Amino acid sequence: MIIDGLNLFFRAYMMDPSLGPNGQPTGGIKGAFKMLQKLVRENNPDKIFFCWDGPKSSIRRRAINSNYKEGRKPVRLNRNFGDLTEEDEKKNRYWQYARVVEYLNEMPIAQIYIDFVEADDAISVLCRELPNVKKTIISNDKDFIQLLDANTFLYRPCKEETYDVEKVINEFNIHPTNFALARAFVGDASDNLPGAKGVGLKTMAKRFPELKEEKTILLTEIIDSCKNEAKPLAFHNSILESEKLIKDNYDMMQLYAPSLSIGVREKIRDIIDNYPASFNKTNLRKMMLEDGTGNFSWTELFANLNMISITSKVKNEQ
């Protein structure tokens, strides 16, 4: 099971109203582990990877488009907590995030957090390094659809639905292999990446039915098709007018071959090969007492993590 860490944490942070002993919000912590318990119950994984955005992780994509992720509003609580100021909330949010990382450090769970590397790219490398292993990506982000194959699935908690190759084709008439290409024409408002005017996924699928095939379609093939159109529509002209924009979008959106150094790939390979097997329940219980998260029933999660710990230790000794 491969988890998009911030995606899960922010959902927990906004939804769970829990408070700690000092009256400060702790929903990001408590909610994250409630979600983790549910995910472990439903997926029964033998390994869990949490992937986080590393420091300065947006630099590479912002070098292509300086507006990448610009204008995003900070994640805020959807409820009031007395005299908690915006600055107090920001500090609390960061503390909760760091605390989740500390909890995970005591569990048989691998975390990937590398300078200049976004979680999306780390997840892509994980999938490429484990081609023959059944794995489920946990994220609401549709960017991961492009990584789906016979052994790779995407679970979107917001809709409580799992995508496989067949579901993607049935819903979008686009094969996962060509999903990033199609989205490059459409853009991604969540990352502040505009697309060609008047172009949507449904239109792309209708005008270019070859996108439904497993065969990789090239950006140049779509552009050339528009250039050679005998009776071009506004749709075709819009694409041709936005050619550079679309190319830049694709360079940022595609996860098939993330632009990562050999050193970064080796770090991720090392994390896979040296999966953490330790499970420090004593430290976890101390943290739970400090944060007031002990009233959440950890029994089921602990039992599942204990099994992962035992299995990992056996494999590490082989």
Q: How does the language model describe each region?
A:
Residues 1-138, 144-161, 254, 259-274:
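Noncatalytic, basic helical substrate-engagement surface that gates or grips nucleic-acid strands
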